[in-house]
């Protein structure tokens, strides 16, 4: 029942976590997520990974790195309450969790934002890091990033510029 979920969640310790999202598919989410997972494991932290949506390939990579089962967070089949419960129940014996998004951050069902990675980040209150593949870009990346950050109310906390040339670091 709803009351059982709320009572359970009240007894769950807050879990440091981050969601790795992308501006689009193919921007490097999986490679960067796996790198982050490996870096955390190398620090001997106990990590719980998640994957947005019904994907099973990326979770296998996560599980191989962390040594524990990756969980799927699918907003199409789960309510916000369900998503919070799933994240909360795995928080008791881990130091940190990393969630990998699916598609573009705001890409949901049909042409809406609903049931997207954005939905998962908002419903679970997970700080989000956006990945942008900026190969071949210069100043154009600035309004793209600004637009993504300002488009909806969201928990975006940072940006990673993937395939960024050394000269663009200064931007």
Regions found by a protein language model. Name each.
Residues 10-27, 31, 37-124, 132-155, ...:
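ATP-dependent carboxylate-amine ligase catalytic core
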Residues 130-133, 160-162:
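Conserved beta-strand segments of the P-loop GTPase G domain that flank and frequently precede/overlap
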Residues 2-12:
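Pre-Walker A adenine-sensing motif
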